[in-house]
């Protein structure tokens, strides 16, 4: 009985610690970037095998690339349809959106280095606090019925993630997410792409991007 009681007590302590951690106050962080909704881009960008290709239908990856580039280069930021057009020119479109390698190559075209990685909560937080946005490839679940891209863009005071979802304004502006939730939503062995631009100081990028966001308001 003592052993059973000890197990119950340990479980209760762990649950209490988990709840306390969930409520802990942390330094909030926001990486200011343009927030694009792919449904605002319904016009055909190019034709693939006699079918019109639009950002609205298959451009979540292009929208995420545009948001990341807009964060680093606020004065020279492409829009999602510009990115999708470039994908077509480079032959990166394969009929059902853009693959992970395509996103990495598109970022490279804009001078941003993307590296797909497996990440735990601490690695995600450390990366964001360095000023590097993270593109995540999510599988079937909360965000999508199949495959989808979102951008991790900040941390709230209560230790949750801010996410830019190009498929949903509500999930972008009105929702926050536990680290464990986003890790669980990731699809594949390496679902997180760290985005860096070495020749642009992070502080400068954040300041200029914030100024541009303020002007848009």
Roles of regions detected by a PLM:
Residues 55, 67, 74-76, 90-93, ...:
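Solvent-exposed loop/turn segments at secondary-structure junctions
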Residues 2-21:
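Sec-dependent N-terminal signal peptides of Gram-positive bacterial secreted proteins and lipoproteins
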Residues 18-92, 140, 207-208, 213-216:
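Active-site-adjacent structural segments surrounding the nucleophilic cysteine of cysteine proteases
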Residues 56, 61-68, 79, 83, ...:
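Stable alpha-helical elements in mature extracytoplasmic
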Residues 24-28, 33-37, 155-217:
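Noncatalytic regulatory segments and standalone regulatory/sensor domains
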Residues 15, 138, 154, 194-195:
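Hydrophobic side chains in beta-strands
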Residues 78, 83-119, 129:
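Mid-length scaffold segments of soluble, non-membrane domains
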Residues 113-164, 168:
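Active-site-adjacent substructure of cysteine-protease-like catalytic cores
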């Amino acid at each position: 009985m003592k052993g059973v009681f000890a197990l119950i007590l340990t479980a209760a302590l762990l649950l209490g610690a988990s709840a306390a951690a969930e409520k802990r106050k942390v330094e909030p962080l926001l990486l200011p970037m343009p927030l694009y909704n792919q449904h605002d881009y319904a016009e055909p960008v190019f034709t693939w095998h006699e079918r019109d290709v639009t950002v609205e239908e298959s451009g979540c990856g292009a929208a995420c690339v545009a948001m990341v580039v807009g964060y680093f280069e606020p004065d020279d930021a492409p829009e999602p349809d510009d990115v999708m057009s470039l994908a077509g020119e480079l032959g990166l479109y394969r009929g059902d959106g853009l693959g992970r390698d395509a996103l990495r190559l598109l970022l490279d075209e804009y001078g941003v280095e993307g590296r797909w990685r497996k990440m735990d909560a601490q690695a995600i937080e450390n990366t964001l606090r360095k000023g590097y946005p993270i593109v995540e490839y999510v599988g079937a679940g909360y965000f999508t019925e199949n495959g989808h891209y979102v951008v991790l863009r900040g941390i709230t005071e209560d230790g949750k993630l801010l996410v830019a979802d190009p498929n949903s304004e509500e999930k972008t502006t009105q929702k926050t997410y536990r680290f464990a939730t986003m890790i669980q939503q990731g699809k594949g062995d390496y679902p997180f792409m760290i985005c860096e631009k070495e020749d642009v100081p992070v502080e400068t990028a954040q300041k200029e991007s914030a100024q541009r966001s303020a002007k848009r308001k």
